[in-house]
Amino acid sequence: MNIRNSLILIISTILFFSIINGSLSLDPTCVGAPDGQVYLFSSWDFKGDRYVYNVSQGYLSLSDGFRGNVQSFISGADVCFVKWYPIEQYQITAGESHRNYAALTNFGQRMDAIIPGNCSNIVCSPK
């Protein structure tokens, strides 16, 4: 066996065992969203259109492409997902993600807005 084939065999073996042990993953949730940001996706499995929300934006009314169409998300911040009429809210914490959020709670199909921090910060709905 020549050196080239030996290197290929060694590298393949290392990659194989890394994947088996879970130390190497191609899952985007392993990367996560940066601190202070939330990634919203229009399709399951973190695909489709992506909206990047930053807590410095404060209250955000979702655009038409995402209002009622948050299929998956990755959060790097504590935020509150909100539906205004009738009011519903879900507390999301930093590090939380879901690859099929719309199917889990069906809330992704009703969501209107994001508010930074805790859901207890909500006083009244916008007019």
UniProtKB/Swiss-Prot annotation:
Signal peptide per UniProt: 1-25
Subcellular location: Secreted
Keyword Nucleus: no
Keyword tags: Glycoprotein, Secreted, Signal, Sporulation
GO cellular component, one term: extracellular region
Tagged with keyword Cytoplasm: no
SS bond list: none
Glycosylation sites: 54, 118
UniProt GO BP: spore germination; sporulation resulting in formation of a cellular spore
Similarity field: Belongs to the Dictyostelium gerABC family.
UniProt-recorded name of the protein: Spore germination protein 2
